[in-house]
C-alpha cells in the first residue's frame, strides 16, 4: 500500500520518499510544505514518536538538534538580534559566527561584547547552543524563557545528553528525572512543545499529525479487507 510506504518513509525522515510514493495520489500526510519548516516540524514530531516508544536513549541522544532548533528560533523571534546566521560565514555546510560579521552592526557589536566577556576574546567558530544561551540570557525579555525553559534545555544537554552520547548505558525516566528534575514526557510536553509554540515553530494542531496519519492508515487497511 502506497500510504503505508509513505508513512514508513516519513518515520525515516525521508521526504523524497514520501513525495515520490504519494505524487499520484490524493494523500497529503506532511503538514509543513516549505523545506526548512518541514524539516524542523518533522524532526520535533519524530522525537515525540521515539518518546512514545519509550526509547529514552534515542530520545535523549536526539535532544541536541532539537535544542539548536529551539534556541535559534528564540534568538530570531524573541530578541532584537534576529537570525543568528546573519552574523555567520558559511564554510562548506557549517555556519561560523565571526567577529567580522558581528562588528558590522550595533546589535552585533553588543553580542560580540557578551561573547568577549564570557570567552576572554571570542574567536571565530561554529556557533553552538552555549553561544545561543548567552545571547538569550542577555537579549531576551521573556523571563519564563530565560529562567525556566532555557535552563532545562541546556541542563538536558550538559548533564544528560552529552555524558551518554558516546557510551553504552541504559536510560530510563528515573535517570532522566534524577539529572534534570523532570521526566522525558514532561521535557517534551511542557518544555519542547511550549517553546516551539511560543516561537511560532509549531501550531497546536500539528502535534496530532501522526495520529491523523495513523487513523487514515487504519481506515484504508479496513477498506482493503
Locate the predicted segments by residue.
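Charge-enriched, short contiguous segments at helix-coil
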Residues: 137-212
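Conserved non-transmembrane functional hotspots
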Residues: 211-223
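Charged, helix-rich terminal subdomains or tails
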Residues: 14-16, 25-26, 106-110, 114, ...
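Charged alpha-helical initiation segments
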Residues: 1-56
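Amphipathic alpha-helical interface elements
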Residues: 33-129
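Regulatory/sensor and coupling segments of signal-transduction and defense proteins
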Residues: 78, 124-125, 129-139, 159-160
Amino acid at each position: 500500500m502506497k500510504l503505508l510506504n509513505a508513512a514508513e518513509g516519513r518515520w525515516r525522515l525521508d521526504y523524497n520518499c514520501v513525495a515520490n510514493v504519494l505524487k499520484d495520489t490524493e494523500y497529503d500526510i506532511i503538514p509543513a510544505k516549505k523545506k526548512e519548516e518541514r524539516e524542523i516540524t518533522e524532526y520535533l514530531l519524530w522525537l515525540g514518536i521515539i518518546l512514545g516508544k519509550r526509547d529514552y536513549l534515542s530520545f535523549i541522544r536526539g535532544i541536541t538538534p532539537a535544542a539548536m532548533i529551539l534556541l535559534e528560533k528564540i534568538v530570531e523571534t524573541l530578541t532584537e538580534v534576529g537570525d543568528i546566521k546573519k552574523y555567520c560565514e558559511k564554510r562548506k555546510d557549517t555556519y561560523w559566527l565571526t567577529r567580522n560579521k558581528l562588528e558590522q552592526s550595533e546589535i552585533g557589536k553588543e553580542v560580540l561584547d557578551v561573547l568577549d566577556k564570557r570567552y576572554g576574546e571570542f574567536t571565530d567558530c561554529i556557533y553552538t547552543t552555549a553561544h545561543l544561551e548567552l545571547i538569550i540570557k542577555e537579549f531576551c525579555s521573556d523571563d519564563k524563557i530565560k529562567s525556566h525553559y532555557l535552563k532545562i534545555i541546556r541542563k538536558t544537554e550538559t548533564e544528560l545528553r552529552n555524558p551518554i552520547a558516546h557510551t553504552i548505558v541504559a536510560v530510563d525516566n528515573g535517570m532522566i528525572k534524577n539529572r534534570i528534575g523532570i521526566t522525558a514526557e514532561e521535557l517534551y510536553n511542557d518544555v519542547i512543545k511550549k517553546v516551539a509554540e511560543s516561537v511560532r515553530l509549531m501550531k497546536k494542531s500539528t502535534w496530532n499529525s501522526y495520529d491523523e496519519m495513523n487513523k487514515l492508515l487504519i481506515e484504508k487497511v479496513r477498506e482493503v479487507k
